[in-house]
Amino acid sequence: MNIHDKYMQRCLELAQEGWAKVAPNPMVGCVLVRDGHVIGEGFTAPAGGNHAEIEALSAAGDALGATAYVTLEPCSHAGKTGPCVQALIDAGISRAVIACEDPNPEVAGEGIKLLQDTGIEVACGLYEDQARELNKGFIKRHEQGMPWVLVKMAASLDGRTAMASGQSQWITTPAA
């Protein structure tokens, strides 16, 4: 495992802190590193709150010359919060390591382009599969226009959900 793996894995751990809290936003984690030391970390707050990058910048205080590791391309549009990409640029980061591109049409590569246009070195694709898996609902909604749906069905061995009389019987256990 190299040093970049370590920081991106931490980003993925942080992103999971947003599980079931951040929709319709994606779960994002961000770690800021300078001179081999973590200077700030963050994850996306519930909708309307700060994004991961803003949380990490706030924790760092001074991010000049730092490398930003982030699980999803920083947003480049203003919604309930300002664009994260501009906050990273204004903070003076020197490098961004991004797991995956944001499929949201309002971003879709624009965040990466803005970073590169200001001279910030950008590397993409580190742990991309894991980052996409973490946000499969968000990604499917933007790439295919459909939600990610999860269904649980319990049936008896003969494919029934109740007896012929309509009376329901336990066919699963609490652990299921």
What are these regions (language model features)?
Residues 27-36, 153-154:
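Short beta-strand scaffold segments in enzyme catalytic cores
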Residues 10-14, 55, 59, 114, ...:
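Alpha-helical scaffold segments in soluble metabolic enzymes
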Residues 7, 11-14, 26, 38, ...:
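Generic hydrophobic secondary-structure packing signal
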Residues 3-23, 141:
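Short, basic/aromatic recognition patches
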Residues 32-130:
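Zn2+-dependent cytidine deaminase-like catalytic core
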Residues 11, 29, 75, 115, ...:
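Residue-level signal for inorganic ion chemistry
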